[in-house]
Each structure stands twice: as structure tokens, then as C-alpha cells.
Swiss-Prot record:
The active site is at residue 138. This is Serine/threonine-protein kinase PknB. It comes from Mycobacterium leprae (strain TN). Residues 1-328 are cytoplasmic. The keyword Metal-binding applies. One of its GO terms (cellular component) is plasma membrane.
């Protein structure tokens, strides 16, 4: 199987950026969002292995849940259809930068302050992942990038777990390749927790400070042995310029016993910040040669004084004894595993076949179940089946079943859940809610809820869509949201008087109105100014209504009050306001002697708008 040049009609694959234990990473172009991304694709030779296939998919989901500025973001996951079957991939943030491994190999050790800042950011990323239940398991300089803007980015969350949990012999090299950063518990094959990542990050800090990892050997086995048995040389003895306070932080992170390490990455970060600001860390100070000489000379000159170091030595001996017991337990465990393997081989090839009880692995992760069965000497094969109650990648049952007695070396079929059965969501558009539920139920779906959304008047009370949408596949246990039209959305018309047309339309857009017409009206307001709307302001109408904007022609002036004025005075005043029309002189009226020849009546009245070429009627007193 080869990797196709396009994935899901969206991602154009470019150059290969690198290879991992189970994947290859390509530079790619997201043609939908027009941005560069990095795409991790499961290796073609592993895509047909159900264990790797399911674990890669699950780890992709875990990684996508980690949204943190110091963690390479996961944008999308999916599967590309190839001639040989589905090929899963993960779409990630493309980081333009270099890994710590490349930086140290090119430039050598980093200044302590810079190293502290980088690892402190990495601590934040790891602490966030631990709080979300994800252990990295493969912290190393190659998995920490520094971007072109000096941002720290931790990569490959969870992928190392897929390799470490696998029983495939072909993956041995992938584990050995990171032996220089394995925690002692990883090297012994014990279960690990967040403190294992703290140890590995301590190895990273050691290397970027000194230019070399804490342990170097001729083979991965010898390096792993040193992680379990040997104490690291303090970084300050490997490279100058490193303070004893920073030594203390590194060596506490590299404690053999997890109980003696930082219990969280946040604790390690807090000590790094203390050292960065010139304060002593909480980690115990590492004695220099001068300190030891001073203590010895002090002890020689105080004969007869009670020795407190005897108790310390005794405690240390007890600790070492405990460590020795732990190492013997590990040796015994290894011998036990070898014994089981030898017995299984004898039963298979050289002796009589014996019956072995099938362990109960129901509900376990498939990779763990495979290990448990193969440790009993069984051959295994996996069969994927949908199941509505067992989570994906977990065991539904085995054939033969749990506790059955079968011959050693027989094949056990492991039925692995792919999650609930997937069905295509039918199109229920334009149906009412009841009929839509009936159609969805007939397609196998069981849970529904209604949501209302604005619609055209014709679709009021009708289905306008579903979530997931029609023709998409969904688990039959998922809740299908049926979206029912509630008719046109209504809004209150805002007051836009006094605004020019363009501004008025933008303000109406904010309220959801998008349809407009204009009507020019006589008005003394400036030309082009909105003097009103139809429907009027504050009216509540559907947002798809046409809003008429009444726009001033600017062809009027405001009629002044001419009462008591002689015509000789009134006319110049009107002309000054732009009036070009003619006077309609009405019959004189009886207004008393004092109003003789003065304006006693006018039309239009004072304050009204008058067209500049309009007729004005005046009546004078007699």
C-alpha cells in the first residue's frame, strides 16, 4: 500500500518531513483553508494490523483533545481510502522550526537560562497532558521543537504508547531508539505514570545543558541498564557554567525511585523558575567535592560530637537495600517470563500438549488482551465487530470464551469492538417532527431531540435539517438532533433617521434586515438623509421584510412665521430662504385697525416644509 498524494480531497501531500516508529510525516497543503499543515500517516505495512490501526485511531482522538499553546495542535483526523483498505492519518499544526536534537547537534550545549526557559514551557505542556489523562511516554529532544518565533512545541503525544503496548516484534527498534531517555520503570517494563515523563524530561534538560544524554553505552541494553542501576554525573561536572542549584533540579528529576522525583511536571517547572530568578530550588542540594572535603575536615575536628551523618548513611543504605530488593524482584520477574516461554515451547515442540485456561479479557484494550493471551502461549487473531455497549478498541468476547480449557498454542479469536454500528442518516427534510422520527427509527436510530431554527414561512413546523446531516454516517446510539423551522425570524426596526442611506443600511444589517427599497420624499432635511422608514421604527417585523427608506429630496425650506408683517418685509424674507414660487393673495380679512395691510393668515403654516417653487397663500388685514 502506498500513501496517496491527496487525502480526503482536501490535503495535498508534499515532501516527507520525517519518519517515526509507526508513521511518516508529510508537509501538506490544506486546499480548503489555504494553509500549510503537517500530516502524520500510519505506516503502510502497519495499516493492515488491527491492533495498530485501532490504537493509532484512538491516540489520534486523544491528541486532538490536547489544546495547549506549547503542544503541536491537531486540526483533523480521518481515513483515506486506498486499494488495500483504509489508511488513517492525523492533520497537525505545521511548525516552522527545528527540534532540540538538531539544535544541540548543530550548536552544542545551550546557555542554562535558555535551557531552563525551554524546559519550563515543556513542563507546562506535559502537565496539561497529564491532567487530561495522557502520558507522553516518548519525551526526547527530537519531540520538542523550537519555532521560528522561539515558541516551544511538544510533539507526538500518545504515539509512543501505541508502540510500547504492542506485542509486534517488528517494533523493537522503535523502543530501542529512545533508550537514552527511558525512565527506569520503562526500562524494567513496569507500569508507568506521569513521573516517567518527568524523568525523560530530566534527560532532555541534561542533554541540552551538557550536549550529551546522562547515560551513553555501546548498546541500547547497556544504556537501559545504566538508567536502572547507575547514578548520573551532575551536569556541572560535564559542562562549565551550570550552577549547583540547576544540578539539584536535574538530579531530582532523574531520581531512580519515582517517589523521590518531582511528582508532577508543574513541580519541576516551579523549581526551574526559582533557579531562573536566582532563588534556591526545593530540590536537595548536590554536594560538590569542596563541600565533601569541608564536611570531612569538620568531622575530624569534632571528635566526640554526635555524628548525624551515620543516620544519613543508614537511611541511604536502607534506600539502596530497597533498590536492591526491587532489582531482584525485576530479575525474578524476567526469569519467570523466560520460564513460561520455555515451558510453552516445550509443550509446543517437544512434549505433550496440555490444556490452558483462557483468561477473561472482556472489556480490556485489544493490545492488552493480545499480550495476556500470548503470555499464556496462545496464538491470537482479531475480529472487528460493532457493539453498542463496549467502547471501540476494547474486547467484546473471545472464542473459545473466558475460562474455557483449550490446548496450549491453540488460536484464540478476539472479538474487538469498533463501537456502535454506523448507519447513514436519511434525508427527512420537509417532514413534520413525528414523521421524521419514524423515518429515522426505521433506519436504526434510537435517540432524538428537537431544535428550532428560523425558516421561510413555507417551512414553519417542517424539518429543515438534522445533526448529523443527511447522508452522513453516525453511530446508531448517537442522539440525532432534528431541526424544525420556526418561521421567519422577527426583529424590531431600529431608528435610522438622520443617517445617510449607506449607514442606515449597515445599521439595519446588524439587526438582520437585508432587503431595502428607497422612496424620495419632499423634506427640508439635507438631500440624501433618511427621514423615516416603512414599516416605521420600533415595529417588529420578519427579518426578510423589505424595509423602505424614506430619503429627503432636500427641496424644501421651513416656513417662517409671517404674522403681522407687511408684504414688503415678508417677501424678501421668503426669497432669502430660497423661495422662487408665486404669491397667492387671498381676500383681506377683518383684523382690526392695527393690522391694516399686515399678514393676518398664511398657508403653509409656520414650521411646515415648503417646496422652494411652491405657492404661498397670504391674507392681509383690512
Amino acid at each position: 500500500m502506498t500513501t496517496p498524494p491527496h487525502l480526503s480531497d482536501r490535503y495535498e501531500l508534499g515532501d516527507i518531513l520525517g519518519f517515526g516508529g509507526m508513521s511518516e510525516v508529510h508537509l501538506a497543503r490544506d486546499i480548503r483553508l489555504h494553509r500549510d499543515v503537517a500530516v502524520k500517516v500510519l505506516r503502510a505495512d502497519l495499516a493492515r494490523d488491527p491492533s495498530f490501526y485501532l490504537r493509532f485511531r484512538r491516540e489520534a482522538q486523544n491528541a486532538a483533545a490536547l489544546n495547549h499553546p506549547s503542544i503541536v495542535a491537531v486540526y483533523d483526523t480521518g481515513e483515506a481510502e486506498t486499494s488495500a483498505g483504509p489508511l488513517p492519518y492525523i492533520v497537525m499544526e505545521y511548525v516552522d522550526g527545528a527540534t532540540l536534537r538538531d539544535i544541540v547537534h548543530t550548536d552544542g550545549p545551550m546557555p542554562p537560562q535558555q535551557a531552563i526557559e525551554i524546559v519550563a514551557d515543556a513542563c507546562q505542556a506535559l502537565n496539561f497532558s497529564h491532567q487530561n489523562g495522557i502520558i507522553h511516554r516518548d519525551v526526547k529532544p527530537a519531540n520538542i521543537m523550537i519555532s521560528a518565533t522561539n515558541a516551544v512545541k511538544v510533539m507526538d503525544f500518545g504515539i509512543a504508547r501505541a508502540i510500547a503496548d504492542s506485542t509486534s516484534v517488528t517494533q523493537t527498534a522503535a523502543v530501542i531508539g529512545t533508550a537514552q531517555y527511558l525512565s527506569p520503570e520503562q526500562a524494567r517494563g513496569d507500569s508507568v505514570d506521569a513521573r516517567s515523563d518527568v524523568y525523560s524530561l530530566g534527560c532532555v534538560l541534561y542533554e541540552i545543558l551538557t550536549g550529551e544524554p546522562p547515560f551513553i553505552g555501546d548498546s541500547p541494553v547497556s544504556v537501559a541498564y545504566q538508567h536502572v542501576r547507575e547514578d548520573p554525573i551532575p551536569p556541572s561536572q560535564r559542562h562549565e557554567g551550570i550552577s549547583v542549584d540547576l544540578d539539584a533540579v536535574v538530579l531530582k528529576a532523574l531520581a531512580k525511585n519515582p517517589e523521590n522525583r518531582y511528582q508532577t511536571a508543574a513541580e519541576m517547572r516551579a523549581d526551574l523558575i526559582r533557579v531562573h530568578s536566582g532563588q534556591p530550588p526545593e530540590a536537595p542540594k548536590v554536594l560538590t567535592d569542596a563541600d565533601r572535603s569541608c564536611l570531612l575536615s569538620s568531622g575530624a575536628g569534632n571528635f566526640g560530637v554526635p555524628r548525624t551523618d551515620a543516620l544519613s548513611r543508614q537511611s541511604l543504605d536502607e534506600t539502596e537495600s530497597d533498590g536492591s530488593i526491587g532489582r531482584w524482584v525485576a530479575v525474578v520477574a524476567v526469569l519467570a517470563v523466560l520460564t513460561i516461554a520455555i515451558v510453552a515451547a516445550f509443550n509446543t515442540f517437544g512434549g505433550n500438549t496440555r490444556d490452558v485456561q483462557v483468561p477473561d479479557v472482556r472489556g480490556q484494550v485489544s493490545a492488552d488482551a493480545i499480550s495476556a493471551l500470548q503470555n499464556r502461549g496462545f496464538k491470537t487473531r482479531t475480529l472487528q465487530k460493532p457493539d453498542s455497549t463496549i467502547p471501540p478498541d476494547h474486547v467484546i468476547s473471545t472464542e473459545p470464551g473466558a475460562n474455557a480449557s483449550v490446548g496450549a498454542g491453540d488460536e484464540i479469536t478476539i472479538n474487538v469492538s469498533t463501537g456502535p454500528e454506523q448507519r447513514e442518516v436519511p434525508d427527512v427534510s420537509s417532514l413534520n417532527y413525528t414523521d421524521a422520527v419514524k423515518k429515522l427509527t426505521s433506519s436504526g436510530f434510537k435517540s432524538f431531540k428537537q431544535a428550532n431554527s428560523p425558516s421561510t414561512p413555507e417551512l414553519l413546523g417542517k424539518v429543515i435539517g438534522t445533526n448529523p446531516s443527511a447522508n452522513q454516517t453516525s453511530a446508531i446510539t448517537n442522539v440525532i438532533t432534528i431541526i424544525v423551522g420556526s418561521g421567519p425570524e422577527t426583529k424590531q426596526i431600529p431608528d435610522v433617521t438622520g443617517q445617510i442611506v449607506e449607514i442606515a443600511q449597515k445599521n439595519l444589517n446588524v439587526y438582520g434586515f437585508t432587503k431595502f427599497s428607497q422612496a424620495s420624499v419632499d423634506s427640508p432635511r439635507p438631500t440624501g438623509e433618511v427621514i423615516g422608514t416603512n414599516p416605521p421604527k420600533d415595529a417588529t417585523v420578519p427579518v426578510d421584510s423589505v424595509i423602505e427608506l424614506q430619503v429627503s429630496k432636500g427641496n424644501q425650506f421651513v416656513m417662517p412665521d409671517l404674522s403681522g408683517m407687511f408684504w414688503a418685509d415678508a417677501e424678501p424674507r421668503l426669497r432669502a430662504l430660497g423661495w422662487t414660487g408665486v404669491l397667492d393673495k387671498g381676500p383681506d380679512v377683518d383684523a382690526g385697525g392695527s393690522q391694516h395691510n399686515r399678514v393676518a393668515y398664511q398657508n403653509p403654516p409656520a414650521g411646515a416644509g415648503v417646496n422652494r417653487d411652491g405657492i404661498i397663500t397670504l391674507k392681509f388685514g383690512q
